[in-house]
Structures are given as structure tokens and as C-alpha cells.
Amino acid sequence: MARYVFITGGVVSSLGKGLASAALGALLQARGFSVRLRKLDPYLNVDPGTMSPFEHGEVFVTDDGAETDLDLGHYERFTGVSARKTDSVSSGRIYSNVLEKERRGDYLGKTIQVIPHVTNEIKDFLRVGEDEVDFMLCEIGGTVGDIEGLPFFEAIRQFAQDKPRGQCIFVHLTLLPYVSASGELKTKPTQHSVKELRSIGIAPDVLLLRSERAIPEKEREKIALFCNVRKEAVIAAYDLKTIYEAPLAYHREGLDQAVLDAFGISPAPKPNLDRWVDVMDRLENAEGEVRVAIVGKYTQLEDAYKSIAEALTHGGMANRTRVRAEWINAELFEREDPSPFLEGFHAILVPGGFGERGTEGKIRAAQYAREKAIPYLGICLGMQMAVIEAARNLAQVKDAGSEEFDHEVGKKRFTPVVYHLKEWIQGNHIVERKHDDDKGGTMRLGAYTAALTPGSRVSEIYHATEIEERHRHRYEVDVRYREALEGCGLTFSGMSPDGRLPEIVEIKDHPWFIGVQFHPELKSKPFAPHPLFADFVRAAVEVSRLV
């Protein structure tokens, strides 16, 4: 039976609950325990799949096709444990499930209420898989006091009450602000946050204090006294240069020991943190630097491409090189020469995205990389842009484009070399889609197998002829243009097992030019960099040595 750790936040949002949860999971793993991490989000969207990246950041996709919060990416990167659909839930999903049950008559005519029906649905979610691991770490989104979060706080209060004593603990993350006028760290916001938490029946066992300044011993003692928490369980959470320092930093502060003490686990197994020491060594002792241009649409918010930024960092670790990723808005050169914007970069990456805005700039970026022999990695839409560029400028399909950008019914602006995907094979059955389907959850989602051409660059990078990668798309390159494009040098080196869906394209007569329909960044880890990103950065290093 799993022990449960509930991670909550107070004072302000975006303090780093997800990273704290991931770091704690990594520390418990380092002591020999098995873990699983979960995220409970109070928003009413069923999932983040239809939310704007500017609202929510990136959507992290699991192997089994769930569209989830980006925090699940942190969980996977820090622990190596693949997330599942059952590791993410929102108020929207909970209420949807409850209302479906009501319509079916499952509640036998009873009046449906937040308590007990909604809270019971949340508790049922928490119980899934509780026999599989030693620790279940559950992060509650938002902050204590948010009205939309109240059913979740009530549910975890009940859940802990239902479990045997010592089976559940609560970790609360708050802000310790520094007031420059008085030269002091202020503890009052933390005291009020804990007071709010206790008012709904939850007493924190461990406090994490986010601070940009060293926390004096007297302030820790004060917080311990007023918040009724052991002094040893008042843990500093300082600002760090890199998120990958978090496991070592939290261990130095005693977080993992405080959690084990709260559970009464003694003596605790000693941690083996060698791989995190190696990660930090590779980051801090990089032997060079490469500049990578990320030509995208959502460049104002780095969280929109969070996994890509982290995967590039991992690729740098694999090559003991610092990767300086620079975000460039593709709209800047939709109608002009991209050279002034892209000169001086050692590699170019065009990530996934939706909609027509900025696509001509991405196509120009792919052309620049192809003609200037600059390493190019196109992901999802980035692969489609590379194919459209090759179709226009090499295969002489001058009006090549995507069905995604032909908005007017009956009026075609482009010859669609990229089309709306209407059916594909998933497991042993065929999935069918129509243009007028709902937007949410209707894409080709999750892990799919691809067959690689023996002797191709990608087969050499993967050291395999069959791979499995995660997808999130509803448009696909039209395989009918394969012969024309391959005749111009753009090879289709990865295909779906049935040979119908192009998964990877590459240019042989180029230092490094690869487009992939899937999202390799979602499977990269600091201690296991994704092979595509590792080799992409290696190619950038080669270019940097020629400059």
C-alpha cells in the first residue's frame, strides 16, 4: 500500500510545486523507494489540450495519449517514470465523470452534491494504482484559498482521514518575501497561508519556504512555532541557477529526511545521488557553447516549449556543451530574408505548433538551414514546414502548402502536400476523424511505432530500425509526394508500420537535416538524453568548430 504525500501551495502561484514534487520523487528513488507522481488541477477544462500555450504553457503528452500539464514533464524527467492518463486530472474531468454517472443513473436518484459525490470521484482517482508503488506524490494545482480548489482540498482531507495514521502527509510550499525597506524576510504570509490550510482541516507536516535570501535560524524557529511544525521540517527552497540542482539542494536542506521522519521511517536507507552529481558536473563544467535558434510562434513564453528547452539542455550534457537556445518569432521574416535573424547560429530548430500565423517564416528558416548547410531539426509542424519548403523549391510544386491553412470552403490556395488526417491504425483498430469533430482529444495522440530505413541517418542515431515515439497532431505529410521529394534528395527514412504515414524525413547530402512528425523532446531525460537531441547538438558543435 502506497504512502501518500500531498504537495500544496500558498501565498502566490508559480512557486515551483511541480519541481519540488519532482525533486522529492527523485530523492525517494535515490533511497531505493518506488514512486509515482500525480497532478490535480482545479481548472474546469477537461484537460489542457485545447488551452492556448500563452494561457497554460506546453501540453505534455503521455505514452497512452493523455494531454496533461507540463509538470508531468518535470515528473518524468526527474524520475524516469513514464506518466499515464491516470496521473492527471482536472475539475473539468471530475465534474464530467460525475455528470455522466448521474445521466446513467449510477447514483440511483440521489441529489448530486460536491460533498460527497465530487469529493468521492477525486478520492477514487487518488486510489488508482496505490498497490503499485511505495510512495504516491500528489500535487494540488493553484493555491490554498482558491475557490475552485476547495473540493480537492476537502477530498485530500477526507482521504487522509480514511487512511491509517501515518499513511498520508502534507507538504506545503509558501513564499518568504524579502522587504528591502526593512531588510527583513517576512514570515506573516506563510503564517496566514498555513492558517488558511488548517482552517479546512489540513495541518502541514513539512513546510517548504521559497526564498531568494538565506533564512536565519530565528526565522525558522518562529515559523515552526507559529505554524505548529517541527523545526527540522521547515525546509528552505532557495532560487537555483538550474532546475537540475533541485534534488541535491533539497537533500542538503533535509527535505527527504523530513518526509521520511514524518512517516516514521527509521532508519532511512541512505541515498545514492551519483547520477545527479554527474548531471550537475556536466552542466557546470561544459567545455564549449553552441547557439541554437528556435524559430517558433509562442516565443514570448518559454513554457510553451518547455520540453524542447530541457531536451536541448540534455543534448548539451551528452556533449559536455552549453546550449544557448534563443527564441525567434517566425513572423519577423515571413516576407523577408531570414539571414539577418539566423546568421551566427550553429543550428536551427522549428518546433510544433498550430495555425497559419508564422508558417512562412518557418518555411524560410527550413530553406535557410538547407541552403546554408546548418543543422536543422523540425518537430511535428517543423517537419511539415521542411517538406513544404522542399516541395516548393526542389520538387517545383510552387503552391505547396497544408490543408490546415485553407480556411475557405471550396476555395483552395495551396496544393496540399500536408493533409488532414482522417484515419490511422491504433493498436488493432482503425481510428477515424472528421473535420467537424470536437477539438479536444481528437488528434493522433500518444506513442506510435515507426519503421526506420536501414542505413539512414536516423537508424544510425537510434541504433535501431524500429522506434516508438509520442505524437500530437491532426495533419500529416501526404505519402503520395514521396517519390517526387525523394527524387530531389528529401528521403522518407521513417514510416508508420503500414507504410501510409511519413514519420521522419532527412536530407542525406547535408551535414544534419531531419524532420520528425513526433515529439522526441517528451522522452528526453537529464540522465538519458534523447538520441536525436544528443546528435543534433553534436552536429551544432561540429559547425561551431568551423566558424
Curated annotation (Swiss-Prot):
GO terms for biological process: 'de novo' CTP biosynthetic process; pyrimidine nucleobase biosynthetic process. UTP binds at residues 13, 186-191, 222. ATP binds at residues 14-19, 71. GO terms for molecular function: ATP binding; CTP synthase activity; glutaminase activity; identical protein binding; metal ion binding. CDD domains: CTPS_N, GATase1_CTP_Synthase. Pathway: Pyrimidine metabolism; CTP biosynthesis via de novo pathway; CTP from UDP: step 2/2. L-glutamine binds at residues 353, 381-384, 404, 474. GO terms for cellular component: cytosol. PROSITE patterns: GATASE_TYPE_1. InterPro entries: Class_I_gatase-like, CTP_synthase, CTP_synthase_N, GATASE, GATase1_CTP_Synthase, P-loop_NTPase. The active site is at 380 (nucleophile), 519, 521. Its EC number is 6.3.4.2. CTP binds at residues 13, 146-148, 186-191, 222. It catalyses: UTP + L-glutamine + ATP + H2O = CTP + L-glutamate + ADP + phosphate + 2 H(+); L-glutamine + H2O = L-glutamate + NH4(+); UTP + NH4(+) + ATP = CTP + ADP + phosphate + 2 H(+). Gene3D superfamilies: 3.40.50.880, P-loop containing nucleotide triphosphate hydrolases. Residues 291-546 form the Glutamine amidotransferase type-1 domain. Belongs to the CTP synthase family. CTPSs have evolved a hybrid strategy for distinguishing between UTP and CTP. The overlapping regions of the product feedback inhibitory and substrate sites recognize a common feature in both compounds, the triphosphate moiety. To differentiate isosteric substrate and product pyrimidine rings, an additional pocket far from the expected kinase/ligase catalytic site, specifically recognizes the cytosine and ribose portions of the product inhibitor. Catalyzes the ATP-dependent amination of UTP to CTP with either L-glutamine or ammonia as the source of nitrogen. Regulates intracellular CTP levels through interactions with the four ribonucleotide triphosphates. This is CTP synthase. The gene is pyrG.
